[in-house]
Amino acid sequence: MANQGDFPKRTETKKRPLHNIYGKEILRKRLEEENFSRTTLSFYRYVILENVQELRDQLYAEWEILGVLGRIYIAREGINAQLSIPSHNLDFFRKNLDSRNQFKDMQFKIAVEDDSKSFLKLDLKIKKKIVADGLNDDAFDVTNVGKHLSAEEFNLHMEDENSIVVDVRNHYESEIGHFENAILPQSDTFREELRILLELLNGKENHKILMYCTGGIRCEKASAWLKHHGYKDVNQLHGGIISYAHEVSQKGLESKFKGKNFVFDGRLQEAIGNEVISSCHQCGAKCDRHVNCENPGCHVLFIQCPSCSEKFEGCCTLECQNVLHLPKEKQKEIRKGKLNENRFFSKSKIRPKISELYHGILFKSSK
């Protein structure tokens, strides 16, 4: 890795593959051995990109030299990136983006909290869309987006009786943190969210709509979608929750966001407010700790307190805990569905199901 002040250069002569070739253990060890800090950030832009495959390969080669780790999606319609970079290479990375007109003057959303371990590898994928929305972009004007509001403006408009605050994230995100009095659609995906929004906001076309998401990208498409359906006063939080937290801190504003901000990297969350507004899905204790089930065949994301983590060995259900103690070959058979055709391993609204399972069955049997 290049030292601060040195422009990183590729020194090897052998052509390197333009994808990760190492396992998680090696990647984790490398990350732990780094003796410098990293900056976690995100950015996006809707912009027409040409020769996407060629661009993807160029970016991978250039960003690998800079030590970039993260998840980046590029498509004909633009780029969506969540990544970490050695802090001493941040200026070089900015210059790299600015060297392409499509990415010039990109706005970064810097993480509110950062342990320098948000990502293990560089994963740069070509997608049909940079956000999976299920929409036909030819059917409406995707550029006719809502008005962008600063944190101060967003707070002010929240006081308006005619305002409706709408969370444009999935239910497992809003569960651990959201704005006061916001509508919280119980969706698993952004595609589903857009359909639910029209149902929840039916008849409120003349209200002031205040939308927000993590970094702003989902609001771009959702606001245009609502305006297409006749909503006249559609607004969105500029830069999302991440930028809101920074502006509130810098200007000494009141934070109307309660709890934590869910993030799609190794951190899983970052503190915005001090409140814990969610509960353990297994015992009901106050908790906002997201984990993945330790059963490799499940790996579902759910909220688990330290006590239940010890009791269930990090698993979401007794079934998964039992699977965890089976021989490895038997576990593989289960994951393939050979021994469990009706298995419980599903991400679709699994989180509330876990809660219902434990409150409805385990708690009832203990009385």
UniProtKB/Swiss-Prot annotation:
<dbReference type="InterPro" id="IPR022111">
    <property type="entry name" value="Rhodanese_C"/>
</dbReference>
<feature type="active site" description="Cysteine persulfide intermediate">
    <location>
        <position position="213"/>
    </location>
</feature>
<dbReference type="Pfam" id="PF00581">
    <property type="entry name" value="Rhodanese"/>
</dbReference>
<dbReference type="Pfam" id="PF12368">
    <property type="entry name" value="Rhodanese_C"/>
</dbReference>
<dbReference type="GO" id="GO:0006400">
    <property type="term" value="P:tRNA modification"/>
</dbReference>
<dbReference type="InterPro" id="IPR036873">
    <property type="entry name" value="Rhodanese-like_dom_sf"/>
</dbReference>
<dbReference type="Pfam" id="PF17773">
    <property type="entry name" value="UPF0176_N"/>
</dbReference>
<dbReference type="InterPro" id="IPR001763">
    <property type="entry name" value="Rhodanese-like_dom"/>
</dbReference>
<comment type="similarity">
    <text>Belongs to the TrhO family.</text>
</comment>
<dbReference type="GO" id="GO:0016705">
    <property type="term" value="F:oxidoreductase activity, acting on paired donors, with incorporation or reduction of molecular oxygen"/>
</dbReference>
<protein>
    <recommendedName>
        <fullName>tRNA uridine(34) hydroxylase</fullName>
        <ecNumber>1.14.-.-</ecNumber>
    </recommendedName>
</protein>
<feature type="domain" description="Rhodanese">
    <location>
        <begin position="159"/>
        <end position="253"/>
    </location>
</feature>
<dbReference type="InterPro" id="IPR020936">
    <property type="entry name" value="TrhO"/>
</dbReference>
<keyword id="KW-0560">Oxidoreductase</keyword>
<keyword id="KW-0819">tRNA processing</keyword>
<dbReference type="InterPro" id="IPR040503">
    <property type="entry name" value="TRHO_N"/>
</dbReference>
<comment type="function">
    <text>Catalyzes oxygen-dependent 5-hydroxyuridine (ho5U) modification at position 34 in tRNAs.</text>
</comment>
